[in-house]
């Protein structure tokens, strides 16, 4: 068996990626979230496949087909809530994964990092089009508001959002194409995830100390396969508690009402995992400026490798940047809270301050703290 896995053309790839892969001996549980994201993706694809068997992408029957899945299909309620809450678990793992990458300086592996940003954007797009499919009030109005932002793009904006809508409003054509996008995008994510792994295995994993670990590596199996299995078990435990005890806690009550173009909800907001970006969008009074800030709130992650001037890898021995990092995390939580609040004083002012702080920390404070720490080393 050992000879087979080392010589067989297909098994050799698996062997080099998951069995004999040399891995730093000191990587902590923060490195588990990559495998948890893989698990989340598998859960989403499988549950999504079964949901697609019963769902109809037509404005007249979409809402009732979701109700039919929950009421009449065997374990349909379980599949639907696994899919809906699985998306939340996916984003929790994604945010922690990116946060760990920033804290431990994984952005120096620039190819892996940039593919990760593409994965992040693709996952956000998938979640957005998926949120529209149940065709509830918040689904419809969320789709209308967010796609309408494309009209802010100079020259081509008007044509672009009419093309995405498939008409002059969000209607049957929009729902049909969003369903098609939602079906195909997870497979594109899976392909990008393989490329992400390919680039990671070219350079080898980072580790918590930020030091070179070539002299102290162990095989991935059985050490980290066991560790990953424990992480997957804990993820499934949390997901099942969420699904079986609090299935609607992360949803929006407005989505229990069928979509009605003549009745606008009091407060249109996306799912919780988009609220930080939505708060940044709303904090700028100009439409085009808001859209640019929204896009930059994610694309600014690509600036980390470019702005990194530190002589040390990661934040483990950098107390000044550690403080700034945790302020950044707190600021993100404030943005998430503001995104779910109505557009009125004092929430608008807090949102504007938090948005400025978000960009200032990445562009100004972290590079300045890098310079300060580099000078401290020289003392």
Curated annotation (Swiss-Prot):
Which positions are annotated as binding heme b b566? 97, 196
The record's misc note reads:
Heme 1 (or BL or b562) is low-potential and absorbs at about 562 nm, and heme 2 (or BH or b566) is high-potential and absorbs at about 566 nm.
Q: Does the keyword Transport apply?
A: yes
The UniProt annotation places heme b b562 binding at 83, 182
Does Electron transport show up as a keyword for this record? Answer: yes
* Primary location: mitochondrion
Gene3D superfamilies, A to Z = Cytochrome Bc1 Complex, Chain C
For biological process, the GO terms are: mitochondrial electron transport, ubiquinol to cytochrome c
What is the topology of this protein in the membrane according to its UniProt annotation? Multi-pass membrane protein
Q: Which cofactor does it need?
A: heme b
Give the residues the record marks as binding a ubiquinone. Answer: 201
Which lineage?
A: Eukaryota, Metazoa, Chordata, Craniata, Vertebrata
Q: Which UniProt keywords apply?
A: Electron transport, Heme, Iron, Membrane, Metal-binding, Mitochondrion, Mitochondrion inner membrane, Respiratory chain, Transmembrane, Transmembrane helix, Transport, Ubiquinone
Q: Which domain of life is it from?
A: Eukaryota
What name is this protein filed under? Cytochrome b
Cofactor note, please? Answer: Binds 2 heme b groups non-covalently.
Protein family according to the UniProt entry: Belongs to the cytochrome b family.
The gene behind this protein is MT-CYB
Compartment(s): Mitochondrion inner membrane
Q: Pfam families annotated for this entry? A: Cytochrom_B_C, Cytochrome_B
Chain segments annotated as transmembrane: 33-53, 77-98, 113-133, 178-198, 226-246, 288-308, 320-340, 347-367
**InterPro entries for the chain:** Cyt_b/b6_C (IPR005798), Cyt_b/b6_C_sf (IPR036150), Cyt_b/b6_N (IPR005797), Cytb/b6-like_sf (IPR027387), Cytochrome_b (IPR030689), Cytochrome_b_C_euk/bac (IPR048260), Cytochrome_b_N_euk/bac (IPR048259), Di-haem_cyt_TM (IPR016174)
């Amino acid at each position: 068996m050992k000879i087979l896995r080392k010589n067989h053309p297909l098994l050799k790839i698996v062997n080099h990626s998951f069995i004999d892969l040399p891995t730093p001996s000191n990587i902590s549980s923060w490195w588990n979230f990559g495998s948890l994201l893989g698990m989340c993706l598998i859960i989403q694809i499988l549950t999504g496949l079964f949901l697609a068997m019963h769902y109809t992408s037509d404005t007249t029957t979409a809402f009732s087909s979701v109700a039919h899945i929950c009421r009449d299909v065997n374990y349909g309620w379980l599949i639907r809530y696994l899919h809906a809450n699985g998306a939340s678990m996916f984003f929790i793992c994604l945010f922690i994964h990116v946060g760990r990458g920033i804290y431990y300086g994984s952005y120096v592996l620039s190819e892996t990092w940039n593919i990760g940003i593409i994965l992040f954007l693709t996952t956000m797009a998938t979640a957005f089009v998926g949120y529209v499919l149940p065709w509830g009030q918040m689904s419809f109005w969320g789709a209308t508001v967010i796609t309408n932002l494309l009209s802010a793009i100079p020259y081509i904006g008007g044509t672009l959002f009419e093309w995405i809508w498939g008409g002059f409003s969000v209607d049957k054509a929009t729902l049909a194409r969003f369903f098609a996008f939602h079906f195909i995008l997870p497979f594109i994510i899976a392909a990008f995830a393989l490329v992400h792994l390919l680039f990671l295995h070219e350079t080898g994993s980072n580790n918590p100390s930020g030091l070179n670990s070539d002299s102290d590596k162990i095989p991935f199996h059985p050490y980290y396969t066991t560790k990953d299995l424990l992480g997957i078990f804990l993820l499934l435990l949390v997901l099942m508690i969420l699904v079986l005890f609090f299935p609607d806690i992360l949803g929006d009550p407005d989505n229990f009402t069928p979509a009605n173009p003549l009745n606008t909800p009091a407060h249109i907001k996306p799912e919780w995992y988009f609220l930080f970006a939505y708060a940044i969008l709303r904090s700028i009074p100009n439409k085009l400026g808001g859209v640019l800030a929204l896009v930059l709130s994610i694309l600014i992650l690509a600036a980390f490798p470019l702005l990194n001037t530190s002589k040390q890898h990661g934040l483990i021995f950098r107390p000044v940047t550690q403080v700034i990092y945790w302020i950044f995390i707190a600021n993100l939580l404030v943005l998430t809270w503001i995104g779910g609040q109505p557009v009125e004083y004092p929430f608008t002012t807090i949102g504007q301050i938090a948005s400025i702080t978000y960009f200032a920390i990445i562009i100004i404070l972290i590079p300045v703290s890098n310079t300060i720490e580099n000078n401290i080393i020289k003392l």
